[in-house]
Amino acid sequence: MAEVANNEQQGPQFNIQRVYTKDISFETPNSPAVFQKEWNPEVKLDLDTRSNKLSDDVYEVVLSLTVTAKNGEETAFLCEVQQAGIFAIAGLTEQQLAHSLGAYCPNVLFPYAREAIGSLVSRGTFPQLNLAPVNFDALFAQYVQQRQAAAAEAPAEEANA
């Protein structure tokens, strides 16, 4: 009983057990010709997060970033990084846990992924690429709103069928 009471008094717990690169790729499909052209790139960033439960209160979160730089119609480089972390998270409500996995953990992982991308781009001898910070809290809130809107539409569609 004392142990259970002790755990309840501790409240929410969040520990980073490990941060690691799960997958990494850098491609320059049009080299060396791309280096001889005027550099005026259009850079596109795509990102995604996913999580899975490894055991009780232990989760893996993977932040996937894909950066594509096009110089005119040609792809100058394509850089993909999957930055992952193992997190011990306990004492949270379901909603708090979802926010932690969908926003807080990606916030922890993003600087590592940004550094990996910057390093890869630099090693490819392209000009330095500094990715702007990402507001994962806002992205998660948008995701929750979209899911709620989709859930509200689903019963309406069933009623009309």
Curated annotation (Swiss-Prot):
GO terms for molecular function: unfolded protein binding. It is found in: Cytoplasm. InterPro entries: SecB (IPR003708), SecB-like_sf (IPR035958). Disulfide bonds: none annotated. One of its GO terms (biological process) is protein tetramerization. It comes from the Bacteria. Pfam families: SecB (PF02556). Homotetramer, a dimer of dimers. One homotetramer interacts with 1 SecA dimer. Belongs to the SecB family. This is Protein-export protein SecB. It comes from Shewanella pealeana (strain ATCC 700345 / ANG-SQ1).
